[in-house]
Amino acid sequence: MYGLGLLPTLIIPSESVQLGVPEVNKIGAALIAALVLVPPVQAQSVKDQLAAFIDANADQYAEVAQHIWDLAEVGYMETESSETLQGVLRDAGFEIASGVAGMPTAFVATYGGGGPIIGIMGEYDALPGINQSRSSERDPVPGKIAGHACGHHLFGTGSVAAALAVRDWLEDSGTPGTIRVYGTPAEEGGAGKVYMVRDGLMDDVDVMLHWHASSANSASASSSLANKSGKFRFYGQSSHAAGAPWRGRSALDAVEAFHYMINMMREHVTPAARIHYVITSGGSAPNVVPDFAESYIYVRHPDPEESRRMFDWVTRIAEAAAMGTETRMEHEVIHGIYNVLPNEALARAMFDNLTIVGGVEYSAEERRFAEAIHSTFPADAPSIERAAMIEPFEVIEVGQGGSTDVGDVSWTVPTAGLGTATWVPGTSAHSWQAVAAGGTSIGNKGMINAAKTLAFTLYDLFTTPSLIDAAYEEFERRRGPGYVYEPLLGDRDPPLDYRASVVGGGNN
């Protein structure tokens, strides 16, 4: 197996999870103190200068990312992860607004003045139930109940790295404009970005950029699935299941009837629709008629209005299930997110810059680690050589696969993103292999490539007004005339306790 040997010496060891917030803030101060400033005379162009700045500080960025990897804090509980990123930005001269939109771990960091205003988003929440060491073999860490299986420790840090490089250039060049970093919590089911959009925190932004951990390098104009989710709670009457079942009313029967009718519904929705559920509570003993049961439902579709309609249908099914079992039903909308609105003009600019940056080149040790991880995949998995390649540019109008709260942002401001090979090619998101690679120098290298691509694209936007104009014209055309944004999740408050069962955030 290959593990910690891949880590740069500056990466904080796993003991960093014991640090309190004051110690975490020291990381930000130490990073700023250690930043290597690259004189403009050493660069052949501004983009060379931006790349040199990021390369010169790559070890410090890896330190921050791996500290957040160690913390592995779940949605709306990312206290130390958020504080770490805020500390880095604050010490670099950004003005910080913390706890925005009713979310204690959300923040907006601003540097500069005037227009254009370019935003860049960062995430930092981990996933419960998927923890793993920095090993190429399956190796859960005892006592750790979450892991960065979607690479958000890299996402947040890479976005900050890009912002710091561009901040340095803005200051040196005197270029007008504002860069804004949005710290967006709880992407994994908590829809943190939606509350920022709903509160108008992005209304004055000209363009928004983002990126994501991936097993390939790509920057395309692509969409995603809209998604509305909810918890459906059924209340019955307990009784002895053998002695007097007629006196009871089974909440579990209601859930089963609910799911049965949903499965009948599947025949009558379009092929692009996706409906999935889990029973989060179904009773505790077979000899007791359950008086409470709960089902957690996701409803997805490429069209947000169709997702909304299907969720309403599911709600009526739940009402019918309660009626048929003489139980009572309540439901709570947990989150609702739009599909991503593609923007080809921005995506092509991002793609051009990704092509300049290039793919991820493995060292001999990294290659051995990648081969060991790759051996756990099916025979038809993509070759590990794919990490060094750039995927062809595509325009994907109809969403496929997953969902993201970037969708709501993209319907509010022209938005584009990219993915870089932070994982071994063939890796699925939300897997132990993603956690493992993201904790090594492979993940760090992909993050640095993303930071450079974002920084280059930020430079293009600050210096090319016609690019912003083209992006906005496409944005308006795709939204259609008279468009008014209405959040799928309605007026509910952020579900700050939606991971409450995950005691203590990242570790227990």
Segments (PLM) and residue ranges:
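Bacterial N-terminal signal peptides
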Residues: 30-38
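Short, Lys/Arg-enriched N-terminal segments with co-localized hydrophobic residues
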Residues: 6-23
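Sec/Tat signal peptide C-region and signal peptidase I cleavage site
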Residues: 39-43
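Acidic/His- and Gly-rich active-site-bordering loop/insert found
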Residues: 44-148, 153, 157-178
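Metal-dependent amide/peptide-bond hydrolase catalytic core
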Residues: 44, 256-508
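Sec-dependent signal peptide recognition
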Residues: 5, 25-31
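Sec/Tat-exported extracytoplasmic proteins
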Residues: 54-61, 65, 69-72, 76, ...
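Histidine/acidic-residue-rich, glycine-tolerant segments that coordinate divalent metal ions
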Residues: 139-147, 153-154, 170-290, 300
